[in-house]
Regions:
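Walker A/P-loop
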Residues: 196-217
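Conserved helicase ATPase core of P-loop NTP-dependent helicases/translocases
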Residues: 251-254, 260, 413, 420-470
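Extended alpha-helical interface modules used as scaffolds for assembling large macromolecular complexes
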Residues: 1-169
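Conserved helix-turn-beta segment of the N-terminal RecA-like "Helicase ATP-binding" lobe
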Residues: 231-258
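Conserved interdomain hinge at the start of the Helicase C-terminal
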Residues: 380-417, 423-428
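Post-DEXD/H (motif II) to motif III coupling segment of the RecA-like Helicase ATP-binding lobe
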Residues: 293-294, 301-364, 534
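A conserved SF2-helicase RecA2
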Residues: 144, 345-359, 372-375, 489-495, ...
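Conserved RecA-like P-loop NTPase helicase motor core
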Residues: 440-536
C-alpha cells in the first residue's frame, strides 16, 4: 500500500481523493482515458470505458502509459484482471484496418485473422463486405466506409481507417502571422490532426479552436467546408479567417438561412443543412457543390443526429472536429469516434490556464430558499413542470442583481433557458437601474451583432443571453457569468457557459461563474450533474447561501 490519491476498483471505477496533494497530477494523468462520473466535494468517481480507452489509443497513448498512471497513483494494489483488461481493450483498436488497395479499392484487412473471420460472419455487416481477396483481406463496398466503422465499433473491434483521403480541389491558404503566432498547444493539435488525417481536437472554450481550424486549413491548402452552430458563429469564423489568413472576402462564402454562397471556403450552419422539406434535405447539395479537401465541424458535440448520416458518406474527405468536450447528452460519442474520427488531441483546461492563455475562474453555486408559498406550489407541480418552476423562481431576481453589484464595473452575462424568465429578469434589472438587453433566438442577426459590439466596446455592462449564449460567441471582456436556468442537467452546456468568461483578461483578472439554484428542489440535483464536466477539468464549486450574497455590500464601482 502506498499513499496515492487513487483507488482503482475491479468494476473499472476509479476513486480520486480530491484533497490529496497529488490529486491534480493524478487527474491530469488519468483524464486522457478515464471519464468522470460523479464529483462530490471529497471523492471523484471516474470510469474506464472501451470508448475512452480507444480514444486515448488513437490520441497516441498506449496501454503501457495507462497502466503506468494507474499503478503510479493507486493507493492499493491494482486488480491484475483490470490491468489485463485495459491492455486487451486498447489492443482491439487497429486490429482491423481499412486500406485503399490499388487493385481492389477499399478493403478491410485483419492483422489478426481470427478477428476478421469473426466480424465477417456477423449479420450486422451483411451487404457491406464484398469478396474475400485473401486470408487477411476482404473487399468493402466504397459507399459503406462510414457505416462499416460504426458497426465494427459496436461489435467491439474499432477499425483504424488508413484508407486515405481525396486531396480535393487545391486552394492556397496560408496563416498571416504578423504580430502573433500559433501557441505551442495549437501547433501540436494541428500536427496530431495532420498525422491522423481525420479526428477531433478537444480544447477549452477561449483557447483558440478557430485558429487550430485555420492552421489545419493552411496545412491542407484545399477548398474547405466549415460547419457551425449558427450564423453568428459563422461570421466570427469569417472575421478570424480574414484577420489571420491570406483568404480574402471573395474567397469565403456563407451558406445560411440568409445567404446561399458557395466559395472556395464556405461556412454553413448545421440548421440549414438539417432543414427538411417534404421528407428530404434540400441543402445537401452543399456537400457536393465542390470537391472539398477538408470539412471542419465546429462544436462537434452539438452535431445534430441527421448530420451523422450525411457524414457517413463523406469518409473520403478529411474531417476535423473541434470541441470543448466529447460529452454528448444523447450518448452518440461512438458515432463521433467512427464518423468524424477519434480524439487526436486533448489539452486539460487547467494546463492552458496555468500558461496564461485562459483566465483562472472560480465557480460558485448560490442556493436560494423558496418562500413557503412557492415551496407548496413546487410540491404540488406535475413532475415534468418541477424543473421549470424551480429554475424560474422569482426568489432568484434579487440575487442576480446582488451578484452584478458585487462585481462593481465588471461586465456580466446572465444566461438562462426560459425566455419568459429572461424577460422578467430584464424588466427587474431595468427597474433597479441596471439596463440589460436580451439576446435570444428571435433577435435578428443584425441586432444581435449590434448588442455584442456595444458590449465589446464597454457601452453595455450586462447582457442577458438565452440558449444563443452557449455557442461560439466572442465576448472577451465578460468576466462574470450568472447562470439562472439550463437544459436540465447538461454538462456540455455548463462547459460552454463557463467558456464565455474564460477568455484571458488584459490585466490577468479572475473570471467568476455563478449558478443560482433553488434549494431542496430538482434544480439543485440538475446543477450537480451539470458540474461533473468542470470538476473533471479541476474546477471546484463553492456553495454559498443567497442570504450571504444579499447582505454583503456592493463593490465600489
Amino acid at each position: 500500500m502506498t499513499n496515492g490519491p487513487l483507488i482503482v476498483q475491479s468494476d473499472k471505477t476509479l476513486l480520486l481523493e480530491v484533497d490529496h496533494p497529488d490529486a491534480t497530477a493524478c487527474r491530469m494523468a488519468i483524464a486522457p482515458f478515464a471519464e468522470l462520473e460523479r464529483s462530490p466535494e471529497h471523492m471523484h468517481t471516474y470510469r474506464l470505458t472501451p470508448l475512452g480507452l480507444w480514444n486515448a489509443r488513437a490520441a497516441g497513448h498506449d496501454a503501457e502509459s495507462v497502466v503506468d498512471a494507474l499503478l503510479r497513483f493507486s493507493r492499493y494494489p491494482v486488480p491484475h484482471s483490470l490491468l489485463v483488461d485495459v491492455a486487451e481493450t486498447m489492443d482491439r483498436y487497429g486490429r482491423l484496418q481499412l486500406l485503399n488497395d490499388p487493385a481492389h479499392g477499399l478493403v478491410l484487412r485483419g492483422l489478426d485473422r481470427a478477428v476478421l473471420v469473426e466480424v465477417a460472419k456477423s449479420k450486422k455487416l451483411a451487404g457491406m463486405l464484398g469478396a474475400q481477396l485473401d486470408a487477411d483481406t476482404i473487399a468493402v463496398h466504397g459507399s459503406e466506409r462510414g457505416h462499416l466503422k460504426q458497426v465494427l465499433l459496436k461489435l467491439g473491434w474499432p477499425a483504424e481507417d488508413l484508407a486515405g483521403y481525396v486531396d480535393g480541389e487545391a486552394h492556397p491558404i496560408a496563416l498571416r502571422e504578423d504580430g502573433w503566432h500559433l501557441r505551442s498547444y495549437q501547433r501540436e493539435a494541428v500536427e496530431h490532426f495532420t498525422a491522423g488525417g481525420s479526428g477531433v481536437v478537444v480544447l477549452p472554450c477561449g483557447a483558440g479552436k478557430t485558429l487550430v481550424g485555420a492552421a489545419a486549413m493552411a496545412d491542407v491548402s484545399a477548398t474547405t467546408l466549415i460547419l457551425v452552430t449558427n450564423t453568428v458563429a459563422g461570421r466570427q469564423w469569417r472575421r478570424e479567417l480574414l484577420a489571420r489568413t491570406t483568404l480574402t472576402e471573395d474567397e469565403i462564402g456563407e451558406y445560411s438561412g440568409e445567404r446561399k454562397e458557395i466559395r472556395p471556403v464556405t461556412i454553413a450552419t448545421y440548421q440549414v443543412l438539417t432543414t427538411r422539406r417534404n421528407g428530404t434535405f434540400p441543402h445537401l447539395n452543399v456537400f457536393d457543390a465542390r470537391d472539398w479537401g477538408l470539412i471542419v465541424y465546429d462544436e462537434v458535440h452539438l452535431l445534430p443526429a441527421p448530420m451523422f448520416r450525411f457524414t457517413a458518406d463523406l469518409q473520403a474527405r478529411r474531417r476535423l472536429g473541434l470541441t470543448a468536450t466529447l460529452v454528448r447528452e444523447d450518448g452518440k460519442e461512438g458515432d463521433v469516434f467512427s464518423l468524424i474520427g477519434p480524439k487526436r488531441y486533448d489539452a486539460p483546461w487547467k494546463d492552458i490556464e496555468s500558461q496564461g492563455w485562459i483566465a483562472p475562474a472560480d465557480c460558485t453555486e448560490v442556493r436560494v430558499t423558496l418562500p413557503d408559498r412557492d415551496r407548496l406550489a413546487y410540491a404540488a407541480a406535475e413532475p415534468e413542470e418541477k424543473y421549470k418552476f424551480a429554475a424560474t423562481a422569482d426568489a432568484k431576481l434579487p440575487v442576480i442583481k446582488a451578484l452584478i453589484e458585487r462585481h462593481g464595473d465588471e461586465q456580466v452575462l446572465v444566461i438562462g433557458a426560459y425566455l419568459e424568465q429572461l424577460h422578467d429578469i430584464g424588466r427587474f434589472l431595468d427597474e433597479e437601474g441596471v439596463p440589460a438587453p436580451i439576446v435570444h433566438g428571435g433577435t435578428t442577426t443584425k441586432e444581435r451583432e449590434r448588442l455584442f459590439d456595444a458590449f465589446r466596446a464597454g457601452e453595455l455592462r450586462a447582457l442577458i443571453l438565452s440558449k444563443v449564449g452557449n455557442f461560439s460567441i466572442d465576448l472577451p471582456e465578460a468576466a462574470v457569468a450568472v447562470q439562472v436556468s439550463g437544459t436540465f442537467g447538461s454538462r456540455q452546456e455548463e462547459a460552454q457557459r463557463l467558456g464565455r468568461v474564460l477568455r484571458p483578461k488584459g490585466d490577468g483578472r479572475q473570471a467568476h461563474f455563478y449558478t443560482v439554484v433553488s434549494r431542496d428542489t430538482i434544480d439543485t440535483e440538475y446543477a450537480a450533474h451539470r458540474q461533473r464536466f468542470l470538476a473533471e477539468q479541476g474546477y471546484a464549486y463553492t456553495i454559498v447561501d443567497a442570504d450571504d450574497v444579499l447582505t454583503e455590500p456592493p463593490a465600489a464601482g
